Amino acid sequence: MLRNKKILFAFAMLFSSFVNARELEPLADFVHRNPQFMTQLKDSQMLVSRCSALYVVLSVRLNEMQYKKDGDDLIAHLTKASESYELGRLTLSKAGKYDEPSTRFLQKDFAKKYSNITLANWKKDRGIFEDLINEDLKVCEDYAPHYKKLAHNLAKYIGR
């Protein structure tokens, strides 16, 4: 009976991880499918909300794990990147299609999904930088300089 419960629990965790990962389209697929996304305000707002959420979740998870071994630099990097994307989210909200509460709600939804995925990854093999997390992190890292510059220029334009 206990063995069956363990098997059922393991299956539920695996299924939960799969469902959460499938709820989010990989950012690389999104960028490939929509190469002009940076010119679309709605798509840019989605990406900055999602990257901000990813960085927040990763920095919190690493703090929870008391990650060391150059971890302090990594946590500081993730926190700073989160702040940059948050500034981008706020600036694009002022200039854009969705107001700040809408993009904040979107960001919280992404954070919840990323949190579930990192927790499932941790329970599975004691690593959080797996699959979708690692793939999305690469996209967020690649686009961070572009969104930082865009947020800076938009802030000047809208008189922030």
Tell me what each language-model feature is.
Residues 3-10:
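Sec-dependent signal peptide recognition
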Residues 12-14:
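Short stretches within intrinsically disordered, low-complexity N-terminal or propeptide regions
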Residues 16-18:
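N-terminal signal peptide c-region/cleavage motif recognized by signal peptidases
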Residues 21-29:
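Cleaved targeting-peptide boundary
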Residues 23, 44-51, 133-136, 143:
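Stable alpha-helical elements in mature extracytoplasmic
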Residues 29-36:
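Short, charged/polar, low-complexity loop and linker segments
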Residues 37-97:
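Short N-proximal segments of mature Sec-exported proteins
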Residues 78-160:
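Compact alpha-helical subdomains of small soluble proteins
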